[in-house]
Amino acid sequence: MSKVKGFIYKPLMVMLALLLVVVSPAGAGAAHSDASSDITLKVAIYPYVPDPARFQAAVLDQWQRQEPGVKLEFTDWDSYSADPPDDLDVFVLDSIFLSHFVDAGYLLPFGSQDIDQAEDVLPFALQGAKRNGEVYGLPQILCTNLLFYRKGDLKIGQVDNIYELYKKIGTSHSEQIPPPQNKGLLINMAGGTTKASMYLEALIDVTGQYTEYDLLPPLDPLNDKVIRGLRLLINMAGEKPSQYVPEDGDAYVRASWFAQGSGRAFIGYSESMMRMGDYAEQVRFKPISSSAGQDIPLFYSDVVSVNSKTAHPELAKKLANVMASADTVEQALRPQADGQYPQYLLPARHQVYEALMQDYPIYSELAQIVNKPSNRVFRLGPEVRTWLKDAKQVLPEALGLTDVSSLAS
């Protein structure tokens, strides 16, 4: 927070007194306040979280504590659908688009002096926000696929990769929605971007080589081992359940099913536990590899970036820091009303884990997962939009899906 420096007034002469009135911090502050009152920053939070309203409320609350005279206008935008419009000052983007956004000139870099408490950010997350050696986004939240299983299921608890999981679960012969009790795998492989991202994640596991995919791989031919592994996941889930999208678009419906007894195991993000409610205490989770070899843990990283076209770069960078701060993220993740649960998203700052684990022990386990030295941010190259568009057409057929209509982005 900014501090206003005062000074001691001594009545030496009238002229000096008048001069002090003109240049006093109070006068300067008033002028700054008047100027700021005419400024509105346009901002977009990351929409694909269990409770976006908590994030918006936290950002607004923390911002008003620092810059009460600068208004915020929240707008709907996401990096999957479009490049940032010129009038969008600050926004949260998925780092799979970071290289594209940087190379296209959409983002301002952050110098070391522009990042508040950089030492608190998970090192791999900050490294994953760089392009050509410069930071172009402040890490806010992370996502990674986890294998969820019930505490008493010791055999699933011994699984480390999808091939071992298949040996325990086998092929599901049910197309039932919701799936049968304690049978099969619950997993969402419906979207076109989901399939494409899973292919590239698995390719890193299969090759054993981490890459930011500056050069994206060819779609002809596809990697046979990766396709076989993805098909195993579909077989464990059943084709229809794996491609199912509810009419209301509920991204966490499978977590609800799992809490109600469906499926023997569930692969999803940590934030799915918010939907499980109290049942989350009966569940264990762990990372799972797409390869029988060494696992390279990959994390999606949502970063707060500043538009290169903003008319207020200093204020915009200040807002970006507020949005990515430990105070804002902790407030957004905590329950804000009776009957609510933590969002169980993965924050990108150590302080948030330390605070949340005091009240929610699950965050102690999540902290262990994000602090592994082998963790990397999942990044895609500057041609990401073209590659994804092409992959959405190729992958459903390659995966042997009979209903290829589910090409949602």
UniProtKB/Swiss-Prot annotation:
Catalytic reactions on record: pyridine + thiamine = heteropyrithiamine + 5-(2-hydroxyethyl)-4-methylthiazole
Keywords, alphabetical: Secreted, Signal, Thiamine catabolism, Transferase
Signal peptide: 1-29
Pfam families the UniProt entry points to: Thiaminase-1_dom
Coiled coil: none
Gene3D superfamilies: Periplasmic binding protein-like II
GO terms under cellular component: extracellular region
EC number per UniProt: 2.5.1.2
Places the protein is found: Secreted
InterPro entries given in the database record: Thiaminase-1_dom, Thiaminase_BcmE
Active site: C143 (nucleophile), E271 (proton acceptor)
Induction (UniProt): Inhibited by organomercurials and iodoacetate.
Subunit structure: Monomer.
Its job: Degrades thiamine by replacing its thiazole moiety with a wide range of nucleophiles.
Name of protein: Thiaminase-1
Annotated organism of origin: Paenibacillus thiaminolyticus (Bacillus thiaminolyticus)
Lineage, top ranks: Bacteria, Bacillati, Bacillota, Bacilli, Bacillales
